[in-house]
Structure formats: structure tokens, C-alpha cells
From Swiss-Prot:
The name this protein goes by in its record: Mitochondrial import inner membrane translocase subunit Tim10 B
Keywords: Disulfide bond, Membrane, Metal-binding, Mitochondrion, Mitochondrion inner membrane, Protein transport, Translocation, Transport, Zinc
Subcellular location: Mitochondrion inner membrane
Gene name, Swiss-Prot/TrEMBL: TIMM10B
One example GO MF annotation: metal ion binding
GO cellular component, one term: TIM22 mitochondrial import inner membrane insertion complex
Organism of origin: Homo sapiens (Human)
Subunit-structure text: Component of the TIM22 complex, which core is composed of TIMM22, associated with TIMM10 (TIMM10A and/or TIMM10B), TIMM9, AGK and TIMM29.
Motif (Twin CX3C motif): 28-52
Function: Component of the TIM22 complex, a complex that mediates the import and insertion of multi-pass transmembrane proteins into the mitochondrial inner membrane. The TIM22 complex forms a twin-pore translocase that uses the membrane potential as the external driving force. In the TIM22 complex, it may act as a docking point for the soluble 70 kDa complex that guides the target proteins in transit through the aqueous mitochondrial intermembrane space.
Length: 103
């Protein structure tokens, strides 16, 4: 069971990576390659693509670092909120998208 969950997580990670990669490729190509009249990229297009991809990768790393720093605090806050809600008698812990009446 755990192995299947790991495989599913790996597939999700791969899918997410490919989505980011494809979006980055599309964005940089549209920005840096104005025409398809030549088979090869010229030096200016190559430099533009290198710069564009570098900026996007750097931005992605900074966002991921911020996410990694914030995540423990968010998890602790959610745990505290859940514990506080479950400590109050007669009050069911609210879950996003689920109404307390079960409907």
C-alpha cells in the first residue's frame, strides 16, 4: 500500500515538473524567438532563451525556499486550529468543503 502511494507521489511530482517545464519553454520561446524563418537559433535568441530560463528557474527556487520555510508554521497552525475545534464539546471539526450536517 505504501509503495503504491510513493509511486503515485512520484507520478504527481513528475507531472508537476513537466507542467512547469512546458510552461517555461512556451513562455521563453514566445518571448525570445520572433520568427521561425531559420532552422537554427541565432546568438541573440540563444542568449535571450538562456537568460529567460535562468530567471524563471531562479524565481522558482526562491518561491520553493519560501514555501519550505512557511510550511511548518502553516501545519502547526492547522493542527492547533483542529485541536481547538475538537476540544470544544458539541462542535465538530470543520473540514474544507464538508458541511457539519454531512450533506
Amino acid at each position: 500500500m505504501e509503495r503504491q502511494q510513493q509511486q503515485q507521489q512520484q507520478l504527481r511530482n513528475l507531472r508537476d515538473f513537466l507542467l512547469v517545464y512546458n510552461r517555461m519553454t512556451e513562455l521563453c520561446f514566445q518571448r525570445c524567438v520572433p520568427s521561425l524563418h531559420h532552422r537554427a537559433l541565432d546568438a541573440e535568441e540563444e542568449a535571450c532563451l538562456h537568460s529567460c530560463a535562468g530567471k524563471l528557474i531562479h524565481s522558482n527556487h526562491r518561491l520553493m525556499a519560501a514555501y519550505v520555510q512557511l510550511m511548518p508554521a502553516l501545519v502547526q497552525r492547522r493542527i492547533a486550529d483542529y485541536e481547538a475545534a475538537s476540544a470544544v464539546p458539541g462542535v465538530a471539526a470543520e473540514q474544507p468543503g464538508v458541511s457539519p450536517s454531512g450533506s
